[in-house]
Amino acid sequence: MSGPNGDLGTPVEAGAEGEEDGFGEAEYAAINSMLDQINSCLDHLEEKNDHLHARLQELLESNRQTRLEFQQQLGETPSDASP
């Protein structure tokens, strides 16, 4: 697959027959596989980010409600009740 620096591990010869652009089928397949792995990782990160965002929104709303309840118990008027 790839080395620690992202190298494909197979050097491409400039004068290879049938490879005018310098890349063969194996190199394209390796790059495609790496891109698929990166895409999967990014999808996973996006899902985790969405989940964390939803949980933080819930926590924020819960904290607002708790603060309002404490203010009402103390007989104070809420100074920042708007979201």
From Swiss-Prot:
Essential for intermediate filament organization in intestinal cells, interacts with intermediate filament and regulates intestinal lumen morphology. Transmembrane segments: none annotated. It holds the Pfam family UPF0184. The keyword Cytoplasm applies. Belongs to the UPF0184 (EST00098) family. InterPro entries: BBLN_eukaryota. Its main location: other. It comes from the Eukaryota. It comes from Bos taurus (Bovine). This is Bublin coiled-coil protein. It is found in: Cell junction; Cytoplasm, Cytoskeleton. One of its GO terms (cellular component) is intermediate filament. Residues 25-74 form a coiled coil. Residues 1-25 are annotated as: Disordered. Keywords: Cell junction, Coiled coil, Cytoplasm, Cytoskeleton, Phosphoprotein. One of its GO terms (biological process) is bone resorption. Disulfide bonds: none annotated. The modification Phosphoserine is found at S82. The keyword Coiled coil applies. GO terms for molecular function: molecular adaptor activity.
